Structures are given as C-alpha cells and as structure tokens.
Swiss-Prot record:
Organism per entry: Treponema pallidum (strain Nichols)
Organismal lineage: Bacteria, Pseudomonadati, Spirochaetota, Spirochaetia, Spirochaetales
Name of the protein described by the UniProt record: Uncharacterized protein TP_0579
Polar residues bias spans: 40-54
Domain of life the protein comes from: Bacteria
Residue segments, region Disordered: 40-63
Length: 258
C-alpha cells in the first residue's frame, strides 16, 4: 500500500508530470475504480469473502491521498512517455531559485512559483503554446501542509481539502463542469479514518470503521444507504456477513495463520 506523503516538498517534485494522468483519465477517472468494483458485485454471483477484506488496523488510518496518487500515476507515466526514440536528443533543463522552479523537456515546460515561506503557490504546465494544466496550493498561516490543492485542465478540475494535520478530508473531480466523483473522510480522536464516503453517477458508497483495539476493527459497508456487508477483523481471524435488502444472505469466518 502506498503511504500518503504530505507537504510541498513531495508535491512540487512530481507536479510537472501531472498532465499525462489527467489526460489519460479524463474520460474514466482512475478514482472511479472502487465504485465500479463494488457496483459490479451482484448477489447472484458466487460470493468471495476476500472481496470484503477489511483494510488492516495498521493501514486504515494512512490510506493514500487520491490527489497524491493522481500525481504518482502521472510521474510513472511520464517516465514511459519520455522514453521515445528521439528522447536522447532532448536534454532536460531545470532551474530553481527562491521564487520558484522551472523545468523544460522537448516542447513541454513547467513553471512553479513559491510563496514567501518557500511553499508551492501555483504552477503551470505547457506543451508548446498550449496550457495543459494549472495547480494552486492554498495554506493557512505558517502551516507546512496545504489546506487545499486544485488542479485545472481544459476539461477537468480536481480539488482536495486537508485538515490541520495534513490528512485529506475531501476530494472531488469535475469534468466539463459536472461533478463525476467525490470522496470525503472523517477521522477519530486518534487520527484514524472512521468514515469514508464516495459518490459517483452510479451511486453512493460509504464505509465506517470502529476501532475496538489495536488489532480489532469492525467495518460496515453501505451502498446508497443500504447495508451491504459487515467485516469484523481481529487478531488471527476475520468474520464477514453479507446482506441483501436488510437480510443476511451469507456469512463466513476465516482464521489466518500466524
């Protein structure tokens, strides 16, 4: 599992490659994966309890920020896309100073400006004379972590908001002015995820987590407000209950080898 990395040092290092991912996913955003998978589960198909595997207690509070995952996907794709036959004839140019940084490769160039505290403030990515995307980071006071990040392309707008600990609390994607994906997070007093909710054109998915101990987590999954599954994971075992129209239709208990 990819751990989230918050803060401007990580974001500024890979934001130059963002466009590849945004363009590649503008039709079907990568963030839709979870909703599509859960929507595809039908009660008349063989049930596999592994489909309802709960996130481990150690990982649940640290789920990767989808905004940063979008940047990571872009970073990976950029290395592939720049490996063309003539790539060796184009030398990268990088310039960095207190006010910002610039990066150029072939006909693509990126410029990022810093604020007075050396945090990224805004960025643009061009290919030739065409603006591919802009990024804005917003902060509160002297915080290192941004309270908001926004990516804008000609057809897509991605917005993420964060709490004072740098943990993501909301993520949404608009395509051509229409909201196509939204996810919200809530945390408990120990900064662990206690609720995660996703909304797409296909419906609403909600997951709640109840932490009963270090290795004891009760997870409940809802689709459009209707309970779908309860997963109770504790040390060495996992209990799964699957529901349809409010009635339990399947249950299993798994014991894990140490």
């Amino acid at each position: 599992m990819i751990r989230p990395r918050y803060g401007w040092m990580y974001s500024s290092g890979i934001a130059v490659h963002l466009c590849a991912a945004v363009c590649a996913h503008s039709a079907v955003p990568a963030a839709w994966t979870f909703a599509e998978q859960t929507q595809a589960q039908k009660t008349d198909t063989p049930l596999d309890s592994s489909s309802y595997a709960v996130t481990s207690p150690e990982e649940a509070p640290n789920e990767a920020d989808p905004f940063e995952k979008e940047l990571e996907h872009a970073f990976e794709r950029a290395h592939v896309s720049t490996g063309g036959a003539d790539s060796s004839s184009h030398a990268d140019f990088v310039h960095m100073e207190e006010a910002g940084r610039a990066h150029a490769s072939a006909n693509r160039w990126y410029h990022e400006t810093f604020d007075s505290r050396q945090r990224p403030s805004s960025a643009v990515l061009y290919e030739g004379a065409q603006l591919l995307h802009t990024v804005h980071w917003h902060y509160v006071g002297d915080r290192l972590f941004p309270c908001e990040k926004i990516i804008t392309t000609p057809h897509t707008r991605i917005r993420a908001r964060y709490n004072f600990s740098g943990k993501i609390v909301a993520y949404e994607m608009h395509t051509r002015g229409v909201l196509v994906y939204a996810r919200t997070y809530r945390y408990d007093a120990h900064a662990r995820i206690c609720e995660k909710e996703e909304t797409t054109a296909r419906g609403n998915e909600r997951i709640t987590y109840e932490y009963r101990g270090k290795v004891d987590v009760l997870e409940k999954r809802y689709r459009n407000g209707v309970l779908q599954a309860i997963i109770h994971q504790k040390e060495g075992a996992q209990d799964v209950q699957v529901f349809e129209r409010g009635k339990e239709i399947y249950s299993t208990k798994e014991v894990h080898d140490e």
